[in-house]
Design a protein with these regions (language model features):
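Conserved beta-loop-beta element that borders a ligand/cofactor-binding pocket
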Residues: 116-140
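N-terminal Rossmann NAD(P)H-binding glycine-rich loop of SDR-like oxidoreductase domains
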Residues: 1-9
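Mid/C-terminal beta-alpha module of Rossmann-like enzyme folds, strongest
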Residues: 183-259, 277-279, 286-319
Length: 319
C-alpha cells in the first residue's frame, strides 16, 4: 500500500478492517471468505491487484474469478516454501512444487500457497505473476526473527552467535519486495519469479554486527561452531532465527536461484539499512513487536544460551 501511495497511485484495499486513518486510500470492507462480499467489485476496474493471501485457496479462487474481467494484472505474493522439500541449492522456478488444490479448504502453509497460485493462474493466465518470496525481513515483520535478534542484542551481555560468521544469507526486505512487485506489474513480467537477494548479499556476521551496532553495541558476540550447536540440541531457525548451518537439509532456503527477479529489476538495500529501520520500528512500538498468532515465538531461552556458552568455553579450555 505504501509503495503504491509513494507513486501517487490510486490505492484501494479490500479486507475486514474497513476504515483506516489514511484518507488517501479507498477502503472496501468485506470478507473474501464470503462470496457475496465480492459483489463490492461490481462495476469497478483496476490496473493491478496485489494479493498476499495465505489461507484457504478457495478464497483466492473466488477473488481472482471475480476480478478476472475487472483487473489488468494480478500479482500473488507466494513463497519459496511451495517447492517440494528439501529446497535445492541453486533451485530455480522450474523445481517441482508441493501438491495443491485451488478448491482446498485447509492444509499446510506450502500447499495452501500452491493452491492459491493455481487458482489465480486459472483465472488470469498470462496476466498473472507469482512472486515466490524468500525469507522476508524488515520493519513490521510479524514472524519475529529479526526483531528477536535485535532485542537479544539490546539486552546486552555475551551472545551465542551461530557460525560461521561468513555464512551466506538470502532474504528480501519487504519494502524492496513491494517496490519490485509494482515495477514488475507495470512492465508485463508474468509467470513465476523467486524474489530474494542473491545468496551472500549478507552474511550471518554482517547481520549480527549490524544488530549489535544499532542497539548500542553493549553485547559481545561469541561465535560457536555449528557442530557444537547441534550437539547441544539447539535448533536452527526456531531457536536461532534466520540461521541454518552449512550442512543443513534445508540450506537451500538461503541459496535459491533468483536471477529472473534480478533481471526484472529487483534491487536489494544493504543489510545495515534493513536492520536499522527494523530497530527504529521496534523501538517505536515500545520494543514489543507483534507476532502472528499461528507462529511459535522464535528465539533461544536465556538460561539455555548461558549454559551453552559456558560449556563451549569449557570445551575450548580443555581442547
Amino acid at each position: 500500500m505504501e509503495a503504491g501511495l509513494r507513486r501517487s497511485w490510486a490505492v484501494t484495499t479490500f479486507n475486514r478492517h474497513g476504515a483506516g486513518a489514511d484518507d488517501r486510500v479507498e477502503r472496501l470492507s468485506g470478507d473474501r471468505l464470503h462470496v457475496r462480499d465480492l459483489a463490492l467489485f461490481n462495476g469497478r476496474e483496476w490496473d493491478v491487484v496485489v494479493d498476499t493471501w495465505a489461507g484457504a485457496p478457495r478464497a483466492a479462487r473466488d477473488s481472482a474469478t471475480a476480478l478476472a474481467d475487472r483487473a489488468g494484472r494480478y500479482v500473488y505474493v507466494s513463497s519459496c516454501s511451495v517447492y517440494a522439500p528439501p529446497p535445492l541449492v541453486g533451485g530455480d522456478e522450474s523445481v517441482a512444487t508441493v501438491e495443491g488444490s485451488p478448491d482446498a479448504q485447509a492444509g499446510e502453509y506450502a500447499s495452501l500457497k500452491r493452491g492459491s497460485e493455481m487458482a489465480i493462474e486459472a483465472a488470469f493466465g498470462g496476466r498473472a505473476l507469482m512472486a515466490r518470496a524468500g525469507l522476508i525481513l524488515g520493519p513490521h515483520e510479524d514472524a519475529g526473527r529479526l526483531p528477536w535478534w535485535l532485542l537479544r542484542m539490546d539486552r546486552g551481555g555475551e551472545v551465542l552467535a551461530p557460525g560461521p560468521a561468513d555464512l551466506a544469507l538470502q532474504y528480501v526486505d519487504a519494502r524492496d519486495l513491494a517496490r519490485w512487485i509494482l515495477d514488475a506489474a507495470t512492465s508485463d513480467v508474468s509467470g513465476v519469479c523467486n524474489v530474494a537477494s542473491r545468496s551472500g548479499h549478507a552474511t550471518m556476521g554482517a547481520l549480527l554486527d549490524a544488530c549489535r551496532d544499532v542497539t548500542g553495541g553493549t553485547s559481545s558476540l561469541t561465535w560457536v561452531d555449528p557442530g557444537y550447536i547441534e550437539r547441544a540440541r539447539i535448533e536452527p531457525w526456531s531457536q536461532l532465527p534466520i540461521w541454518l548451518p552449512p550442512n543443513h537439509e534445508f540450506r537451500g532456503m538461503h541459496a535459491a536461484n533468483v536471477e529472473r527477479a534480478h533481471a526484472a529489476g529487483l534491487r536489494c538495500r544493504p543489510v545495515e539499512e534493513t536492520v536499522k529501520d527494523t530497530w527504529d520500528w521496534v523501538v517505536s512500538i515500545d520494543k514489543d513487536p507483534p507476532l502472528r498468532p499461528d507462529l511459535d515465538p522464535p528465539g533461544l531461552d536465556a538460561a539455555i544460551e548461558s549454559a551453552a556458552l559456558a560449556a563451549w568455553h569449557a570445551a575450548r579450555r580443555t581442547s
